[in-house]
Amino acid sequence: MNADVLTTKVTDGIAVITLGSAKRMYFDAEMGDALTESLQEFAGDPNIRVVIVTGGTPGYFNRHFSIPALIEFAEAVRASGRQWPDNAAYHGGFFDKAMALCETMPKPVIAAISGTALAGAFEFTLACDIRIAEDGDYLIGLPETELGLLPGASGTQRLPRTIGPAAALMHILMGRPLNPRDAEKKGLVHETVSGKAIDRAMEIGKRFCSHTPESLGYIKRLVRSAIDTPLAEGLALERNLFMRLCVSDQALARMRSYEEKKITDPSRSLEA
């Protein structure tokens, strides 16, 4: 795999995907394919418990989708005469498979936002389960209206599901990205850290690795589906998955250990 596109590394069950280099700070079709391939590999590997995606250049997670590539695509479409009525069939975009993998694999996916993440780059992070940003002089968000566009890689759909429709509408219409601290205040990211985002992501990843993979997968499945599932159905699935875990060897062993005082504080904070 071209190291300018992305690199991967696995440490103690945590897979880290590092996007691009100083030569390649933009999303494009090649990076989309490489990212999808890596995510598919890690999703199917039982030895991988957590996946982290981060940037490969100081000050950048990934700038945004390649504008030259988008112009070339738009000109080709114009020449074809193709039209897009509201009811046109949806065929997916460059990063749809990668984002779907982030959401559906039964493992936590963490975006360690190490710098600028605009437009398509930020939209990709919205498909990740956790977003950690490092503090700095850079921007996060959706500026597409400045180019006469709209967020076309899921931003109009995933951001409302993340921060609510009203806040999402304001952010997208304004087209003004936020600094990391303001992004945290608005709910675009979960945390902003003064150190390296990758260090905090690894800390969280190690905490997740201390849990059983079954519980992590079930929790992700339940919470991810909650917004689109009728409450009665969600509660029924929650109870079924709870019982499946409750009778498992791992859960019984941990509960017995807790009763025997071998585990003194099962609810210790991530901040500990």
Annotate each predicted stretch with a short phrase.
Residues 1-54:
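Conserved CoA-thioester-binding segment of acyl-CoA-metabolizing enzymes
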Residues 171-172, 219-223, 242, 258:
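Short alpha-helical scaffolding segments that buttress acidic/His motifs in well-ordered protein cores
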